[in-house]
Amino acid sequence: MKIIKMLWACLVLIAMNSFSQKVQKAAFQVVPLGVKGGIDEKNLSAYLITPSNTKDYICLDAGTINSGIEKAIENKVFRASASEVLRKYIKGYLISHSHLDHVSGLIINSPADSSKTVYATNGCMEMMENHYFNDKTWANFGDQGVGLPLKKYHFQTLNFNEETPITNTQMTVKAFSLSHVNPYESTAFLIKNGNDYALYLGDTGPDAVEKSNNLQELWTAIAPLIRSKQLKGIFIEVSFPNEQPDQFLFGHLTPKYLMQELHELEKLAGKDSLNGFKIVITHLKPPAKNIVKIKEQLKTENDLGLKFIFPEQGKSFEL
């Protein structure tokens, strides 16, 4: 009888553990405002992310803003006007680099926006101040730089490998350097909320082609978070199919190079550590046939058990 009771208790514990794993809440909500890597100006790189229990979003890059908000409203992600989402829900912007497909939405929507902080590393911030918000290309909506600053946006420079609070949110960010046609830089952002993390990479080429060790250093930094299961997902670009020659990658990844890099990450994090891990594929470049090919190649080459997410504009998902 005692043995039966012990077995019953074990079965109950196993069932409870299984149930708790199934109902475990997601750490972050993501709303893609733009997902493509070119041509379609109404659907360029921009991702809202927030802890699952808040509506205080930070925008990861800002290629497209308003069109993405309107699409999200169509999909009933937001039950508010586009103006309210822009002005009240988006608490700030993290800009990985200053290429137009990552900043054009920020620039165009700045007159209608509310006061908030724009975060970027020094090189990116200088480009935006000197070439965009300069009273020539566009009014200076910042609080520093050339021309007459209108002081709507606070321009905050991020130091690499230094944790910075994101104003008016529960989150912090740590910036890491990426190589995007060496010696030009892009940025990865490690977002933290409590004990949970998400990693977003701006445009990047593979270390082998870029002749850099930026990704290796990034993988080394985040490997412990993979092991501890605190990192809930990685946003990373795949711009071209494998047929794209190295000399025409222009600081981007293919499925082959992404998998090579993720194998390097698995070496650091441990065997099978990426099984079931969420990888959000960003920056797919048209034409449509190339995007189809990229997805097929990723599926074929996925020998790590990764869970690929192909985000759609205006459709939210969880990490």
Positions of PLM-derived features:
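Bacterial Sec-dependent N-terminal signal peptides
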Residues: 1-24
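Catalytic core of the metallo-beta-lactamase
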Residues: 46, 50, 157-227
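Active-site neighborhood of phospho(di)ester-bond hydrolases with catalytic His/Asp-centered motifs
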Residues: 59-63, 89-101, 119-121, 200-203, ...
